[in-house]
Amino acid sequence: MDMASQTSALYMRTHLIGASGGLQLARLVAGDPWTAGAIDHLPAELEEEMAFVRERVEELSGHRESWLGAVVGLGSGVRGVAGVLRVTRGRFRRVAALEAMRSLLLAKKAMWELGMEGRVDFGPGTARCAELNDQAARQATELQALHQRAADEAFS
């Protein structure tokens, strides 16, 4: 694997690690009755995006990235701890959880932007980066609306 491919694969792996925690948080927040189904679609979208990135990492590295499954497993542990702490229950916890999710989504959006610019090697999937960038913008807007509502409730 050449240096450019190594760099792209490492960058994408880093995003996958963050995405695994983000996916678990998204499942918790989407499962909160307070959201009234507004982001029920988010976990499935995140899973699909992660599969797309993982596939490209495997193409670049030339081997199966089996360790990524373990990272997602760790994310499940994070979900368990977060569930015990009830990160989506309580006015301020909900605000903080939504802020964390939105931050992760904006980091992911930056990855898609770099892919669109050709700085990160998505190969034949480069064209899909624009679609995923638009999807990330929509997801962030949805979370912003929930965050605003949560903040109104928390600080009123």
Predicted regions and their residues:
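Carboxylate-rich helix-loop segments that flank metal/cofactor sites and access channels
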Residues: 59-91
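Structural signal for well-ordered, non-membrane alpha-helices
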Residues: 20-23, 27, 47, 51-54, ...
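Preference for long, well-ordered alpha-helical segments
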Residues: 104-156
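Alpha-helical bundle segments that constitute or directly flank the non-heme di-iron/ferroxidase center
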Residues: 3-33, 94-119
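Hydrophobic stripe of amphipathic alpha-helices that form coiled-coil interfaces
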Residues: 26, 33, 53, 60, ...
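Short, flexible helix-adjacent loops and helix caps
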Residues: 28-34, 58, 62, 86, ...
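Actinobacteria-biased recognition of intrinsically disordered, low-complexity terminal regions
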Residues: 1-4, 156
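Alpha-helical scaffold segments that form or flank carboxylate-/histidine-based iron centers
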Residues: 7-15, 33-55, 97-100, 125-136
